Structures are given as C-alpha cells and as structure tokens.
C-alpha cells in the first residue's frame, strides 16, 4: 500500500478530556486514564512532523448536545449512563482536546455522536473534496472508536495507516486484537518512527503484514 504525503491527513480520534484527562468522565468513573497517556504523547510527536509536511490535521471529539437529542439509541438505551451523568457533552470540559495536542487555527475539528468518525459527519466528503485518500490514524479507544472508524474508512477505499503507539485502550487485549484486525483487513499498522520517516520522505510502500499474506 503506497503512502503519499501529498494526499495524506493526520486523523486523531477522541483524544479529549473525557477519555484521557484525569478529571474527565472516564477518570471520574474510576478508569485508569494513565494507560492512554502514551498514545497522546505519540500523537504529540507526530503532529509537528505532519504540520511541517503540510499534512492537514483532523481531530474528532465524542460530543453530544446538552439534551442528548443527537445521541439516538446510543445514549437512550445502549449507554444511558452517559446522559444520566452528563458525560461527553459538547458544552463541557469533557469535549476539550488534550492540551498536549491542542488544535491550531485551520485544523478541522469534527464532533461525532457515534463511535465511527465516518458515520453522520463531514469527514468523508471533506477528504474526497480535497483528494486526500491516505489517512494516518491515532486515537482512543483502539477497540471502539478507532476500530469503528478504521473499518469504515478501509471499506470506502481510503488507505489507512494506523500508528500503534498513537492508539490507546483501557484493555490491552482489545488493543492487540484491534491492531491485528487492522493489519489483516483494513489497512497497514505502521510503527511511529516508520510513519515519521515516510512523512519526511514524502512517500513509502508498506507491505502487508506477513502473518496475513495468504
């Protein structure tokens, strides 16, 4: 799969206070948000390299309206605790991007109300209108919103390059399983340093993982 910086974007999924911050809703519910810190740090290393190469940066946030009218079945029945606890509201600190990777003017910030960043958002039309078909991906959590997004992008013929260090999950088994699924069927899993080198070079060919070359 050929990577070309001239047709690439960096997509950072849900690296926001609600999931990654100690005072965010996940932290308040007792989750160990420190396990996601390495992924934010990796994203912080990718950002300046991509910016220097003029690669657009896109952030997504899981962010609901104050009344959760846009939450559908997700907040009504699947995860009603989100609404009950006022979690992940667009008008509250939960929606804020982590300061280590703060957006700059001109970056695209997409609010989403479903796990996939493709579903019911402007992401796909924005990419197609600009001829950007190579998507470098990092984000949280790997087994939920990252996986939902990678699957949707891969099946829409976008070239997806997942940086494992820039992805984080509360569950290590979910992390490994999802990365294997990405490598098997939906894109390429490219270590951070190799991805940085490709961005600086401007292009690279990434072979299929030999475990799945059958």
Can you name each region flagged by the protein language model?
Residues 6, 24-50, 55-57:
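A short alpha/beta connector and helix-capping loop motif
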Residues 16-22:
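Short acidic, Gly/Ser-rich segments with clustered Asp/Glu that frequently serve as metal-coordination loops
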Residues 55-62, 163:
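Short beta-strand segments at enzyme active-site cores
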Residues 1-9, 45-53, 70, 78-214:
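Active-site-adjacent betaalpha module
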Residues 18, 65, 169:
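Active-site loop signature of alpha/beta-hydrolase-fold enzymes
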